[in-house]
């Protein structure tokens, strides 16, 4: 429990998407989660009640926009409205996984930009600030006119290898051209070169990679991406690296969506281990032998403390530190 008097006006609340992560964040911050209830009427309408006074408090609400994505975003919006009407002085939303982030541009005519719509809804609901981890596209920060603290899981993922002495003869692999920047940051942390899987059609999960740019033969290959959804791209990436002579292949991603038959694909894949974080709660039936889950609870807890204390959070922004 934090004894700092400045924390007397700090409140943390969690909604339904990821209570285990919220509890880890609260433990790191040193205060308990606030009391609230989320109920449903018989027709499915959501009703939220704040069960303690928050008048004049700085509030952080923890909610990933994950499956069921439409329910979780609506829960968050209703919660913000309830907090505002209860006279919270500031309402900060902690969104470990920002759902709809893949819809960040018009890929074809007459398509929406739903990542921008989510930002607009949060702003119109009068959220004060957003904290999130590894956006699918960094430019989503520009969809907001309120502060966005964009944190990175790369140091946490890199620590998995450092802590186990897996530091020699590495190569960090981007599964497509779009992820090169992410792979480069991870490579800097591990002191390793990078390679790129030449996927010419990044929206086609069934495409077999045509070639690999970079030397992977005899190396420990670490494939990194921001998310694993169906698992197809990771699976074919592991196959391509094994065929190219990689000694061992690991997979890393921040957000474990694991839709469709992703678990079966990853368990049967050439990966030695698949390392993810807990930005999304993984149900028990989606755990598998090769899965390793690391927690971003300390990262988000530290960010909340720094924001509350009005301290710079640069060291949390920079994946190289």
Swiss-Prot record:
Binding residues for D-ribose 5-phosphate, per the UniProt record? 225
Recorded hits in PROSITE patterns, A to Z, give:
PRPP_SYNTHASE
Cellular component (GO) terms are: cytoplasm; ribose phosphate diphosphokinase complex
InterPro entries with a match to the protein in the record: PRib_PP_synth_CS, Pribosyltran_N, PRibTrfase_dom, PRTase-like, Rib-P_diPkinase, Rib-P_diPkinase_bac
Residues at which Mg(2+) 1 binds: 136
Q: Keyword Transport, does the record have it?
A: no
Pfam families, from UniProt? Answer: Pribosyl_synth, Pribosyltran_N
Among the GO biological process terms of this entry, one is:
ribonucleoside monophosphate biosynthetic process
Q: Which UniProt keywords are given for this protein, alphabetically ordered?
A: ATP-binding, Cytoplasm, Kinase, Magnesium, Metal-binding, Nucleotide biosynthesis, Nucleotide-binding, Transferase
Q: Which cofactor does it need?
A: Mg(2+)
Binding residue positions for Mg(2+) 2: 176
Per UniProt, subunit arrangement is: Homohexamer.
The record's section on NCBIfam families has: PRK01259.1, PRK02269.1, ribP_PPkin
Function summary:
Involved in the biosynthesis of the central metabolite phospho-alpha-D-ribosyl-1-pyrophosphate (PRPP) via the transfer of pyrophosphoryl group from ATP to 1-hydroxyl of ribose-5-phosphate (Rib-5-P).
Put simply, this protein is called Putative ribose-phosphate pyrophosphokinase 2
């Amino acid at each position: 429990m934090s004894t700092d008097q400045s924390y007397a006006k700090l409140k943390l609340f969690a909604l339904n998407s990821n209570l285990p992560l919220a509890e880890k964040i609260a433990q790191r911050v040193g205060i308990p989660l606030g009391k609230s209830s989320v109920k449903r009427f018989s027709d499915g309408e959501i009703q939220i009640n704040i069960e303690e006074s928050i008048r004049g408090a700085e509030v952080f609400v923890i909610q990933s926009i994950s499956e069921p994505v439409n329910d979780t975003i609506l829960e968050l919006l209703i919660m913000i409205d309830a907090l505002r009407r209860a006279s919270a002085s500031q309402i900060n939303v902690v969104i470990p996984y920002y759902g709809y982030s893949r819809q960040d541009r018009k890929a074809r005519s007459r398509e929406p930009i739903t990542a921008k719509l989510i930002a607009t809804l949060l702003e119109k609901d009068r959220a004060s600030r957003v904290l999130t981890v590894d956006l699918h596209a960094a430019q989503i920060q520009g969809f907001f006119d309120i502060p966005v603290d964009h944190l990175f899981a790369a140091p946490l993922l890199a620590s998995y290898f450092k802590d186990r002495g897996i530091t020699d003869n590495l190569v960090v692999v981007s599964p497509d051209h779009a992820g090169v920047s992410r792979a480069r940051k991870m490579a800097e942390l591990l002191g390793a070169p990078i390679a790129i899987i030449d996927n010419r059609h990044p929206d086609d999960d069934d495409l077999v990679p045509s070639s690999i740019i970079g030397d992977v033969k005899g190396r420990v290959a670490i494939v990194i991406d921001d998310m694993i959804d169906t698992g197809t791209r990771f699976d074919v990436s592991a196959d391509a690296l094994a065929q190219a002579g990689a000694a061992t292949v690991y997979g890393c991603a921040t957000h474990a969506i694991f839709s469709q038959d992703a678990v079966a694909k990853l368990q049967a894949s050439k990966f030695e281990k698949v390392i993810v974080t807990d930005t999304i709660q993984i149900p028990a039936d989606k755990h598998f032998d090769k899965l390793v889950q690391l927690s971003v609870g300390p990262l988000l807890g530290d960010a909340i403390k720094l924001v509350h204390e009005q301290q710079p959070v640069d060291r949390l922004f920079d994946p190289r530190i």
